[in-house]
């Protein structure tokens, strides 16, 4: 409503760091733009517009390799020069790239559906008093949301611990109305400390699998 100009790009250190972007006038909401100049990007999928696949890219921005580590380099750059990002996404007919999540984070639904926890987390993180979250798959196959609430804001607004628990449950119910049946969150678990992160501020998901 305030017409604030912004855009979203996509990149990684190995690509110096830009892979794609679009100016704010032509930016397609939800995407991260089109391939940057002198870069080529494609989706490894039988149907790149509809079925997510790994995002691969090549061009002037791509690194020559990891310093003195040929094995690691060969693990991400193939013989044709394509750098395998490890990210999953789709690309529309105009070349706009939409990221779905990391390939290593993808979960399988009860009927083999691909579930991208980052997409669910993005919705949950925008809900009332949610600071950050992780969606994991329990041993029974159901999805569980681990939530670190914004305790400071909640307490400042007069909420109690019980109120916060009720609000997180209300968020779960509201979220389930926005996602597909196979993406439904069965229950939530509240954490009282911020999730541990890497130096790049990515949550160390592997530390929280025991919550299943």
Briefly describe each language-model feature range.
Residues 1-27, 131:
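Gly/Ser/Thr-rich phosphate-binding loop
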Residues 35, 47-50, 54-109, 126:
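Conserved ATP-binding/catalytic segment of the ANL
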């Amino acid at each position: 409503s305030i017409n604030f100009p912004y855009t979203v790009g996509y990149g990684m250190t190995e690509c110096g760091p830009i892979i794609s972007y679009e100016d704010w006038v032509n930016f397609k909401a939800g995407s991260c733009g089109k391939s940057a100049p002198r870069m080529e990007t494609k989706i490894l999928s039988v149907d790149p517009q509809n079925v997510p696949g790994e995002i691969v890219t090549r061009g002037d921005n791509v690194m020559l390799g990891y310093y003195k580590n040929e094995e690691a380099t060969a693990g991400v750059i193939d013989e044709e020069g394509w750098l395998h990002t490890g990210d999953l996404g789709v690309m529309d007919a105009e070349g706009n790239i939409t990221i779905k999540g990391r390939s290593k984070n993808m979960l399988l639904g009860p009927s083999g559906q691909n579930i991208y926890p980052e997409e669910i987390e993005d919705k949950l993180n925008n809900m009332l008093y949610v600071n950050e979250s992780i969606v994991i798959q329990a041993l029974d196959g159901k999805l569980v949301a681990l939530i670190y609430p914004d305790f400071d804001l909640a307490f400042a607004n007069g909420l109690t611990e019980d109120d916060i628990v009720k609000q997180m449950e209300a968020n779960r119910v509201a979220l389930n109305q926005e996602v597909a049946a196979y993406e439904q969150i069965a229950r939530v678990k509240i954490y009282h400390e911020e999730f541990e992160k890497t130096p790049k501020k990515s949550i160390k998901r592997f530390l929280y699998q025991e919550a299943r």
